[in-house]
Structure formats: structure tokens, C-alpha cells
Amino acid sequence: NNLFGGELLARMDRAASISASRHSRRITVTVSVNHVAFNKAIPLGSVVIVEAKVSRAFKTSMEIYLDVWIEDRESGERIKSNEAIYTFVAVDETGKPVEVPQIVPVTKLEKHRYDDALRRKQLSLVLAGKLNPHDATELKALFV
């Protein structure tokens, strides 16, 4: 028997919420689940580690990148099982979106995820009809 995918999604949402709230120091709400990859089944009873980190902050929204690991109890070895990308928005007491602090990526992985976040956001906005494809400069640069 394996961990139910919906249970893992809920755990990832909680971890992403904590990460977004810590970064913004505000109440945050889930806007979207942009990507989920169920790469490896998680057997029931496994030690599951959900790591959530703000990969990029925009004006009021934050992209949260999640890595999920199965940890061997005896050796401590970790095997990556899943990953996901969520978007959260910080809100005030009335539920109105508020600005969030920017992110300064440090590591190579952080810089990679930071740069990719803008492309993912532009793609999402183009697909939703909220951004003209000609204005998606970072996204267009991939095809030049």
C-alpha cells in the first residue's frame, strides 16, 4: 500500500503555505498548483520529508518549489520521490493582496529556479489570456 496522492498534495500545500507565510510575514492563500510530478510511489509508513522554498516573489504572489523525499530509517539516505510548484498570494486582514519581499537567490539551484519561475509565470499568463505572447520576453527568449 502506498500513500494516497491526495494526502501528499495536502501535505505539500501545508508546507508551501508555511514557506510563503514565513517569507511574506502575512496570511497566504493558495492560488494554483502549477505542476506536480509523482515520480515514485511512497510506501505507507515511510519517513516523508517535504521541503518547500519560495523560488521567486513577484509583486503579491510567490512561487513555491517543493521537493519530496523518502528517507531510509536506518541509513538516513534520501530518495527524491516527488516535486511540485505552487503559487501563493499574501493577503491582508480583509483578503486583499499585499506586496511581498523579493527573493535574492544564492545557490546555483536557487538561481535556476528563480529564472525559470518568470518563464513559468509568463507561460501561465499567456495561456490564461492575461498576457500577449509578444510581451512574454523571457518566454520568447527560449525560442530565439
Task: Name the predicted role of every residue range.
Residues 43-47, 55-144:
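HotDog/MaoC-like acyl-thioester-processing domains
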Residues 7-25:
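Active-site helix/loop of acyl-thioester processing domains in fatty-acid/polyketide metabolism
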Residues 1, 20, 95:
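Short strand-loop-strand
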Residues 25-41:
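Small beta-barrel nucleic-acid-binding modules, principally OB-folds
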Residues 1-10, 141-144:
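A conserved, well-ordered hydrophobic junction motif at loop->secondary-structure transitions
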